């Protein structure tokens, strides 16, 4: 153990668009400084085809943005503060895997794969592997093998590890022949900084392995060779089998920073790297989550985390969620994951739709661009304000929040968004009110998924930019869920959670609960449900559910006729 007094831990949060670094005082939890850097290639739209649901990140985006963010922030610290940095923790989106060669190099870092999207990190929201996910689900339910989807909610998603590997392996012969393994982003960054990227040296995180890779101790780790070979023999012939057997909780040290990376980042060579995990899981820890608190990490999508004890769960498999994994959030507790595939992304879509004439005007009248950009940037806030001033629920359109598929309950990425109950009196603010209600209805469906299976939801916490900046939206969530909604007083809970794990790995705190007591974030305010609105939203929620049951069959896979 080292003294927490004066010690500083860094949390690295790799998001969809940018990386954030946060420096935190290990003793008092003070957020000392932060820096955000956007991924340059991603910002240009490179390697992505939205119409085909292809979203890829070049590893150089992560490296360059991370290096710039850490160096810029460290420069602002005093020399004494720099020398007191003891650890780095890492969280990332997920599942965001990439293929690696026998040296552990991500293929896109090699000249022969530098511009090949299949050699890059396949971002969480890439849905190119829908058919492969359905193959995995069919095999799990075939009776030929044990149901290896049992502990991930019973449905394997196209957003996850094996589906993406299977898709890329079949789509790209060169990548298939060059890759010997795949690695999640949250595992790769600690390995990169500690010089442990060789496949046999990688410390695989319990969080990513348990929630996305079908790893579970009851069947000895990953599914058996025969199961993967039944999907595609390349999974066991071209790739190492097993890719890994052991997994580690995030407070376990991965290693010490290499001399090269210490110099590049301006850090002491004594810095310890803790294990990686997904952003929402570490965000729950940063928010100070306790058992049976539903933590909603709200951004472009949501990830919902709930911690339960093994005695209550027993050997039950909770259906419809994104996994139940011992140690994925807090060591010794079962971490349960759920989520909505689109939350802020739905609002952004609506804003982009309404902004089309602004973009056209900017093309024809370039001198108007500053004013038009200002109008566009204020559009969502203006819509929210206009609807809040007259939140009529009598003619509120019912919207299904499946614009990016559905993650929970019961993952189905074939689903599409649906807008119903329009009339000639429906204006833009009213329709946007329908969008707000839809995201709240999706949140309630997740809560009910837990409660209907005897997993109680005793408290609800919300964190992220939308949670803090949009009280109207959060009040609707409180009314729809009919629960007090606690808003966490930080926009950086994911990075804060990563810093908490770094502090434990470095020895500044004995365990994660102790580190949470010193470092976790406070509650900023609590929103109370309005009883009158609760009744009205209950009626709308029932109509939402009716439309869900009506619409879903229309997105079932089309059976091809045999001639």
UniProtKB/Swiss-Prot annotation:
For this UniProt record, the keywords arranged alphabetically read as follows: Arabinose catabolism, ATP-binding, Carbohydrate metabolism, Kinase, Nucleotide-binding, Transferase
> GO cellular component annotations, sorted alphabetically?
cytoplasm
Q: What InterPro entries does the annotation carry?
A: ATPase_NBD, FGGY_C, Ribulokinase
Name of the protein this chain belongs to: Ribulokinase
CDD domains registered for this protein in UniProt:
ASKHA_NBD_FGGY_L-RBK
Q: What is its EC number?
A: 2.7.1.16
Give the family this protein belongs to, as stated in its UniProt record.
Belongs to the ribulokinase family.
Superkingdom as given in the UniProt entry: Bacteria
Which species does this protein come from?
A: Yersinia pseudotuberculosis serotype I (strain IP32953)
Which PANTHER family does the UniProt entry name for this protein? FGGY CARBOHYDRATE KINASE DOMAIN-CONTAINING PROTEIN (PTHR43435:SF4), RIBULOKINASE (PTHR43435)
According to UniProt, the reaction catalysed is: D-ribulose + ATP = D-ribulose 5-phosphate + ADP + H(+); L-ribulose + ATP = L-ribulose 5-phosphate + ADP + H(+)
């Amino acid at each position: 153990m080292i003294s927490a007094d004066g010690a500083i831990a860094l949390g690295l949060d790799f998001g969809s668009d940018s990386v954030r670094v946060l420096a935190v005082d290990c003793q008092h939890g003070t957020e000392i400084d932060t820096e955000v850097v956007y991924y340059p290639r991603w910002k240009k739209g490179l390697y992505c085809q939205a119409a085909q649901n292809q979203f890829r990140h070049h590893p150089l985006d992560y490296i360059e943005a991370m290096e710039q963010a850490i160096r810029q922030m460290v420069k602002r610290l005093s020399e004494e503060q720099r020398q007191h940095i003891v650890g780095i923790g890492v969280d990332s989106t997920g599942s965001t895997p990439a293929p690696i060669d026998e040296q552990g190099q991500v293929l896109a870092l090699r000249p022969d794969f530098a511009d090949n999207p299949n050699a890059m990190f396949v971002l969480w929201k890439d849905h190119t592997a829908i058919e492969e996910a359905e193959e995995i689900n069919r095999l799990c339910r075939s009776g030929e093998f044990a149901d290896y989807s049992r502990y991930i909610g019973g449905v394997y998603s196209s957003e996850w590890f094996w589906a993406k590997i299977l898709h890329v392996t079949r789509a790209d012969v060169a990548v298939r022949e060059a890759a010997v393994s795949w690695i999640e982003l949250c595992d790769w960054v600690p390995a990169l900084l500690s010089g442990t990227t060789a496949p046999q040296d990688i410390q695989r995180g319990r969080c990513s392995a348990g929630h996305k890779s079908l790893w579970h101790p009851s069947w000895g780790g990953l599914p058996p060779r025969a199961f993967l070979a039944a999907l595609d023999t390349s999974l066991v012939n071209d790739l190492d089998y097993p890719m890994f057997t052991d997994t580690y909780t995030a407070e376990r040290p991965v290693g010490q920073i290499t001399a090269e990376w210490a110099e590049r980042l301006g850090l002491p060579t004594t810095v310890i790297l803790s294990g990686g995990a997904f952003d929402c899981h570490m965000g729950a820890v940063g928010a100070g989550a306790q058992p049976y608190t539903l933590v909603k990490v709200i951004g472009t999508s949501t990830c919902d985390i709930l911690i339960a004890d093994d005695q209550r769960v027993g050997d039950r498999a909770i259906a419809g969620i994104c996994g139940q994994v011992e140690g994925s959030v807090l060591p010794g507790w079962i971490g349960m994951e759920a989520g909505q595939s689109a939350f802020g992304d739905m609002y952004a879509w609506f804003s982009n739709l309404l902004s089309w004439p602004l973009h056209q005007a900017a093309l024809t009248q370039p001198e108007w661009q500053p004013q038009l950009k200002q109008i566009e940037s204020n559009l969502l806030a203006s819509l929210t304000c206009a609807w809040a001033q007259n939140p009529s629920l009598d003619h509120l359109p019912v919207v299904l929040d499946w614009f990016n598929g559905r993650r929970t309950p019961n993952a189905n990425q074939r689903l599409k968004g649906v807008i119903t109950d329009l009339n000639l009196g429906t204006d833009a603010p009213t329709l946007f009110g329908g969008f707000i209600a839809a995201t709240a209805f999706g949140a309630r469906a997740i809560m009910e998924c837990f409660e209907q299976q005897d997993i109680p939801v005793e408290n609800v916490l919300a964190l992220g930019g939308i949670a803090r900046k949009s009280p109207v939206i959060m009040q609707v969530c409180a009314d729809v869920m009919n629960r007090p909604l606690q808003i966490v007083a930080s926009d950086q809970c994911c990075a804060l959670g990563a810093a908490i794990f770094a502090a434990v790995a470095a020895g500044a705190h004995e365990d994660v609960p102790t580190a949470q007591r010193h470092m976790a974030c406070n509650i900023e305010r609590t929103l109370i449900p309005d009883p009158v609105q609760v009744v009205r939203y209950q009626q709308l929620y029932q109509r939402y559910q009716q439309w869900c049951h009506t619409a879903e069959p229309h997105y079932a896979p089309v059976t091809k006729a045999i001639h």
